Curated annotation (Swiss-Prot):
Keywords: Acetylation, Coiled coil, DNA recombination, DNA-binding, Meiosis, Nucleus. Belongs to the MND1 family. It is found in: Nucleus. This is Meiotic nuclear division protein 1 homolog. Heterodimer with PSMC3IP/HOP2. MND1-PSMC3IP interacts with DMC1 and RAD51 and binds to ssDNA and dsDNA showing no preference for either form of DNA. The gene is Mnd1. Required for proper homologous chromosome pairing and efficient cross-over and intragenic recombination during meiosis. Stimulates both DMC1- and RAD51-mediated homologous strand assimilation, which is required for the resolution of meiotic double-strand breaks.
Length: 205
């Protein structure tokens, strides 16, 4: 013979509410601990826990009078309490669904952007490596450049190009100064001062 299954927590809560609705009476805990096992099959040891859960959910009212707690519940209030509870649960469900949707979007966005992020990280790493290599090469070049004939020749050629360019600009400046003196009658010293041209400004030999 199979063992009889005990009541679930929700079944105990439902049967406890039936006691209040059917009797429309006010009870103390000790009264319910006697009545609930007999009328509804709720074990006396679980009455207090079930009762407290109903009080916490606003289904049952509790008032302390003197040294005793008194419990009661009316169908209309229980209905409103259930309605509020249902609304709260629906609200939580809606919020949960929205959070899930937002999270899903974030995941998809992260997936889309992951390749770019990885590529940027890889490029940044390569760039850093190239910079390090460049610094090392520059240091090596500095050590040997003074005794490298090719480097010396390149430096001479670069100096020659720079000298020619500087003298071309010198030509231009002298031409502008000459034009300004003829056109506006400016003194050469004032032109030099206004344009920051040094007194010893001349061609490079």
């Amino acid at each position: 013979m199979s063992k009889k299954r005990g009541l679930s927590g929700e079944e105990k809560r439902t049967r406890m509410m039936e006691i209040f609705f059917e009797t429309k009476d006010v009870f103390q805990l000790k009264d319910l601990e006697k009545l609930a096992p007999k009328e509804k099959g709720i074990t006396a040891m679980s009455v207090k826990e079930v009762l407290q859960s109903l009080v916490d959910d606003g289904m049952v009212d509790c008032e302390r009078i003197g040294t005793s707690n008194y419990y009661w519940a009316f169908p209309s209030k229980a209905l409103h309490a259930r309605k509020r509870k249902l609304e709260a649960l629906n609200s939580q469900l809606s919020e949960g669904s929205q959070k899930h949707a937002d999270l899903q979007k974030s995941i998809e966005k992260a997936r889309v952007g992951r390749q770019e992020t990885e590529e940027r990280a890889m490029l940044a790493k390569e760039l850093s490596s190239f910079r390090d290599q460049r610094q090392q090469l520059k240091a090596e070049v500095e050590k040997y450049r003074e005794c490298d004939p090719q480097v010396v020749e390149e430096i001479r050629e670069a100096n020659k190009v720079a000298k020619e360019a500087a003298n071309r600009w010198t030509d231009n400046i002298f031409a502008i100064k000459s034009w300004a003196k003829r056109k506006f009658g400016f003194e050469e010293s004032k032109i030099d001062k206004n344009f920051g041209i040094p007194e010893d400004f001349d061609y490079i030999d």
